[in-house]
Amino acid sequence: MASLKDLEGKWRLMESHGFEEYMKELGVGLALRKMAAMAKPDCIITCDGNNITVKTESTVKTTVFSCNLGEKFDETTADGRKTETVCTFQDGALVQHQQWDGKESTITRKLKDGKMIVECVMNNATCTRVYEKVQ
């Protein structure tokens, strides 16, 4: 089973399935959905004990958040939502649970065959994004 340290590094998006549908479920407008769907972001994850930082860089936008595992924090997402978020590490996966305006979404990052698989879920919309390590 992967450790949190195994997720550290720079990851590049290689495949994406269902991302536009997931963004639509989040309430993201059409223009931003189209731009975001074309972006090929890098995800940089760093860990220092229980503190993690996740930075997502693309030509469209760069976002970053840092948190302590298990502690709620205020996050501003790439699409501008203000969420109350908590990250945990369970069963070899980094789980990011967001809540806002009575809604919720979960983003799970895990390793499979040397790739980082990111699964985003809101209601019945599920998106799977596959990243390869570049550093």
From Swiss-Prot:
CDD domains: FABP5. This is Fatty acid-binding protein 5. Pfam families: Lipocalin. It is found in: Cytoplasm; Nucleus; Synapse; Postsynaptic density. The gene is Fabp5. It comes from the Eukaryota. Widely expressed. Keywords: Acetylation, Cytoplasm, Disulfide bond, Lipid transport, Lipid-binding, Nucleus, Phosphoprotein, Secreted, Synapse, Transport. One of its GO terms (biological process) is positive regulation of cold-induced thermogenesis. Monomer. Forms a beta-barrel structure that accommodates hydrophobic ligands in its interior. Disruption phenotype: Deficient mice display resistance to diet-induced obesity, decreased adipose tissue and imporved glucose tolerance and insulin sensitivity. The modification N-acetylalanine is found at A2. It catalyses: hexadecanoate(out) = hexadecanoate(in); (9Z,12Z)-octadecadienoate(out) = (9Z,12Z)-octadecadienoate(in); (9Z)-octadecenoate(out) = (9Z)-octadecenoate(in). One of its GO terms (molecular function) is fatty acid binding. The keyword Disulfide bond applies. Belongs to the calycin superfamily. Fatty-acid binding protein (FABP) family. Intracellular carrier for long-chain fatty acids and related active lipids, such as endocannabinoids, that regulate the metabolism and actions of the ligands they bind. In addition to the cytosolic transport, selectively delivers specific fatty acids from the cytosol to the nucleus, wherein they activate nuclear receptors. Delivers retinoic acid to the nuclear receptor peroxisome proliferator-activated receptor delta; which promotes proliferation and survival. May also serve as a synaptic carrier of endocannabinoid at central synapses and thus controls retrograde endocannabinoid signaling.
